[in-house]
């Protein structure tokens, strides 16, 4: 059994960070690949929410989704929030899996305590359980930003999902930040450096 872990919302200017973990075996993973599972960034919202529902209701899958709010990110820092969320998933899921695979290139120093952790760059494209975790995290993030968009329509959160797009930054300059913005994420560099904006828009 493999425990796959991924996140959504790491680079956002607004809203929460979501980290998800999914445990299942090879047979179930294959079932989802046949349903069209892939990295959540390559799925449309309709397919993503469809797969989210299938993951959550599948009898052979265990999953966890941990939310860290903008306020927690401001108070603790993004790195600490990521580590705490991953650790919470590991505490819940490690006894069910003989392999732990995390998307990216860091185990946040947790590989000393959990020696069977493997970090995999672009893991959401290579490991089904990481792709499933990616789908859950992104679906939770999308849903949150759609709900917040109903309160603050000017920021375009239903489209940009909290990332620093041109429209989002222009709205922040004009209207200021909301209580759901990460105030520790300075906008100064993004406004002065259009290249950063281009990179962030490609991440959406």
UniProtKB/Swiss-Prot annotation:
Organism: Helicobacter pylori (strain Shi470)
Protein family (similarity comment): Belongs to the RNase HII family.
NCBIfam families: PRK00015.1-3, PRK14550.1
Catalysed reactions, as listed in the record: Endonucleolytic cleavage to 5'-phosphomonoester
Descriptive protein name: Ribonuclease HII
GO cellular component terms listed in the entry, alphabetical order: cytoplasm; ribonuclease H2 complex
Cofactor: Mn(2+); Mg(2+)
Cellular localization per UniProt: Cytoplasm
Entry function: Endonuclease that specifically degrades the RNA of RNA-DNA hybrids.
Keyword Metal-binding tagged: yes
Binding-site residues, a divalent metal cation: 6-7, 103
């Amino acid at each position: 059994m493999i425990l796959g872990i991924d996140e959504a919302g790491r680079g956002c200017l607004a809203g929460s960070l979501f980290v998800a973990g999914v445990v299942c075996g090879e047979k179930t993973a294959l079932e989802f690949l046949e349903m069209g599972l892939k990295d959540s960034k390559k799925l449309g919202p309709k397919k993503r929410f469809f797969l989210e529902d299938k993951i959550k209701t599948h009898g052979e899958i265990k999953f966890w989704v941990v939310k860290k709010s903008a306020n927690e990110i401001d108070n603790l820092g993004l790195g600490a929030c990521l580590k705490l969320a991953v650790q919470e998933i590991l505490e819940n899921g490690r006894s069910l899996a003989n392999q732990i695979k995390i998307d990216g290139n860091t185990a946040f120093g947790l590989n000393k305590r959990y020696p069977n952790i493997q970090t995999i760059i672009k893991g959401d494209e290579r490991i089904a359980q990481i792709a499933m975790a990616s789908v859950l995290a992104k679906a939770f993030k999308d849903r949150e930003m759609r709900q917040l968009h109903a309160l603050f329509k000017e920021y375009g959160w239903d489209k940009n999902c909290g990332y620093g797009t041109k429209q989002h930054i222009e709205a922040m300059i004009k209207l200021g930040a909301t209580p759901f913005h990460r105030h520790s994420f300075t906008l100064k560099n993004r406004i002065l450096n259009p290249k950063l904006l281009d990179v962030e828009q490609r991440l959406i």
